[in-house]
Amino acid sequence: KKALHLFVNDAIGFGMESEMELKFSDNCFGTADAISFKDGVLRIHDLKTGMSKVSFRQLDVYTAMFCLEYRHTPHSIDIVHRIYQGRDFMETSPNPDDILEIMELMIEFDPVIERMKSVV
């Protein structure tokens, strides 16, 4: 319950939007729990209610979709990721090169998926 309270209070405090859909294409989309982009800082927060080990990879993917959708390069913005779980949160700033790599994969494989869909 503590992480939920922290998550809600921080989302309000940072002026974040909740449940925002990010979409690169019909094949590549997702919903960020809380997100904001202000003064060159992209902030994405995720709430995990389970107790299993978490990874920031999902937030990296959301960041890549944000950059593609809104035409930003990950090197030109600051990025802050938070995952709330249990009684606390973890925070990181991903390497922009990692985000760029995800963006390149999305660009490369989206047309492949489209072609596969037309064959099925």
Regions from the language model: what does each represent?
Residues L47-K53:
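Short beta-strand-loop-alpha-helix junction that forms the active-site gateway
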Residues R57-M65:
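Short amphipathic alpha-helical face segments that pack within enzyme cores
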Residues P111-V120:
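Accessory terminal regions of nucleic-acid processing enzymes
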Residues K1-R43, V54-R57, E69-S76, F89-M106, ...:
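Catalytic cores of nuclease domains that cleave nucleic-acid phosphodiester backbones
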Residues H45-L47, I83:
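Compositionally biased, intrinsically disordered low-complexity segments enriched
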Residues D78-Q85:
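Extended hydrophobic secondary-structure segments that form protein cores and membrane-embedded regions
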Residues L4-L6, L47, Y62:
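Broad hydrophobic/π-residue packing in well-ordered secondary structure
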